[in-house]
Amino acid sequence: MYYIMFLYNMLLIIILIFYSIVGVPIIIFNNNYYWDPDIFLFIIYYFIKFIIIFNLYLYYMINYIVYTPSGSPPGRGTYILLYNMLYSYNMFIDYVMKFITCVTYMYLMFWLLSPTPSPYYVSEVPVS
């Protein structure tokens, strides 16, 4: 039973890694006419997703190295830990990622669209 769960989890992890790598160009270059105006949202969102997923796997590998005796198969605790990290906290991680993405996008748009002392901006000011 646990071996079937392990194979199922490994299949989902392989699919997750595949779509994490392939899904970004599909979303970005899907439109043949012009780039989406939300290209910055996609870039920020998937960059944060990569960081969070990488931190999850790093934490899992550290847990695997520390709590698995050498020369023995991994215990059920590491698999249950990976299951909890990938599925139980999935919605919370997505919420955090969307929040960070929106805040970063708002700050980026404010920084890009705020009036700065450029020649075009200065030339529009009437000289008295």
Curated annotation (Swiss-Prot):
It comes from the Eukaryota. The keyword Mitochondrion applies. This is Putative uncharacterized protein Q0010, mitochondrial. Keywords: Mitochondrion. The keyword Mitochondrion applies. It comes from Saccharomyces cerevisiae (strain ATCC 204508 / S288c) (Baker's yeast). GO terms for cellular component: mitochondrion. It is found in: Mitochondrion.
